[in-house]
From Swiss-Prot:
GO CC entries: Golgi membrane
Region (Disordered), start-end ranges: 1-25
Classification via Pfam families: Peptidase_M28
Enzyme class, UniProt record, top EC level: transferase
Membrane topology: Single-pass type I membrane protein
Protein name: Glutaminyl-peptide cyclotransferase-like protein
InterPro entries given in the database record: M28_QC, Peptidase_M28, QC/QCL
Paired cysteines (S-S): C168-C192
The enzyme's E.C. designation: 2.3.2.5
Protein family per UniProt: Belongs to the glutaminyl-peptide cyclotransferase family.
BP GO terms, sorted: peptidyl-pyroglutamic acid biosynthetic process, using glutaminyl-peptide cyclotransferase
GO MF entries: glutaminyl-peptide cyclotransferase activity; zinc ion binding
Gene this protein is translated from: QPCTL
Amino acid sequence: MPSGGRGRPRLQVGERSLLERPSPPKRRLIPRAQLLPQLLLALTVASVFYTIWRIWHSQTEELPLGRELRGPLIGSLPEARVRRVVGQLDPHRLWNTFLRPLLVVRTPGSPGNLQVRKFLEATLRTLSAGWHIELDSFTASTPVGPLDFSNVVATLDPGAARHLTLACHYDSKLFPSDSAPFVGATDSAVPCSLLLELAQALDQELGKAKERAAPMTLQLIFLDGEEALKQWGPKDSLYGSRHLAQLMESTPHGLGSTRIQAIELFMLLDLLGAPNPTFYSHFPRTARWFHRLRSIEKRLHRLNLLQSHPWEVMYFQTGEPPGSVEDDHIPFLRRGVPVLHLIATPFPSVWHTSDDSEANLHPPTVHNLSRILAVFLAEYLGL
C-alpha cells in the first residue's frame, strides 16, 4: 500500500462568448398609487418561492451526489442506547479470542494463511444471526509462481437490496525466508479482529434485522492477497480484491442489478492499532459518512466512553489527507462503488517491519475504534 500524491482533475472554466449589446428596454410610467400594491405582491410571491426553496435545500444539502443519494438518512442514537451498544463490546474477547489467533505469518498459499481463513469461517459460523458465508477461491499467476487465494465473503441477508460492506485483508506480506517473522498486527490483523468483534457484539440486533427483512444488510469481506509478493504494481498487488470486484460486477443481484451495485458503502479498514492514528476523508462522495464517524468520536469522548483519548488526539481529522493510497478499495472504486477508506495516514512507524507485532499495539486505541465503529453500524443499519 504505497502512499503518494496523485493529481486531481480540476474543473476548467470555459471562455465566455461576447454578448451583443442589448436594445434599450421599453419603459412605461407606473403611477405611484398602482406601484405599491404591485411591489407588495412581488415581495409576497418571492417570499413564498424562497420558503419552498429553503425547505427543499435543507432536505437535500447533506446528501452526497451519485449512487449514495439513496442512502439512509440516519439519526443519532439516544445516549442510553449508545451506552448499551458500547457495553456489548468485550475488549478481552476482541484481543484474546479474535486477535491473537490472527497474529501468525499468513502469506498467500501458506499453512498460516489457510489456518487464519478457516478460523475466520468458523468464527462467523458460530454467530446466531446466521450469516451466509462464501469462498471466492482462485489461482493467479504471481512473480513467485501460481498461487491459490481465497476471499471470505459473509453476508447477513443475501436477499437484501443494499449492502453496507466492511472489508479488510487477512494475508500478511511475504519477506525473505531469513527475515524475522512478520505477523502484520496493524496490517491487517487488528482490522480483521475488529470486524469479528463487531459481528459478535451486535449479533442479536443483526439477527433481528435479518428476521424483519430490512432492506439494508451488513456484509463482511476478508480479502486475500492484498500485499505485493515482489514489488508493488498493478499486476503484483490486490489479488483478492481485483478478482472479487470483477466477480461481483458480473453476478446478478435482484432485478437488473449486480452484486457490486448492491454495495451502498464500502468501508475498508487497514493499518489500525498503533497509538494516535489520524484518519482523513479521501473521497468527497463519502465525506458525509466520514464526518459521521468524527461526530461519534466526539460524542463518545464527551460521554467518557473512550480510553486514553484527550481532545488533542482526535482520530478523525478535517482537511486534506497527506496523500492518496493504493489499497483494496481501488478495484471497487473503479466500478463506481462509494468508498470510505479507514486507514491511518501517515502510516504507523512499524509498517512493513517485524515490529508490527502485538507488543507495539495500543490496546486503548483498538478498543476505542471498536466503540466508534459499533455505534456507527448501529446508527447506519438502524439496529
